[in-house]
Amino acid sequence: MNMFLWILQVLFGIYFTVVGVIHFVVPSGLHAAMGWMYDLSPGLHYISGTAEILAGLGLIIPGITKIQTRLTPLAGAGLVLVMIGAFVWHAQRGEFQNVGLNLVLGAASAFIAYGRWKLQPLPGRDG
């Protein structure tokens, strides 16, 4: 279980960190694939990008450093909240092609949070 959780943490940690960075550094040609991103208010745009970066890093760094490992399940729980917001945003706009991805990402984040909170907590110096 520990190895499976680590694989999920690294994959989703990298994914969310990259997606969060894209909120700030938008590559050319992205508008066609992620046009919805341009419709967010600037404040919400930066908040969601920052949350994704911090939570993505929070899935990986505490476990590697063994410092504040309790942050990993909290990062997973935070990503669940971000994905609930994304689900609502896309559903209200009728962008149902994005809703499935939000559900998968939210479910995986919830599993990581539960797994690192109850099933296989990370060992750490913080207890």
Stretches found by the model and what they are:
Residues 1-127:
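Membrane-interface extramembranous regions
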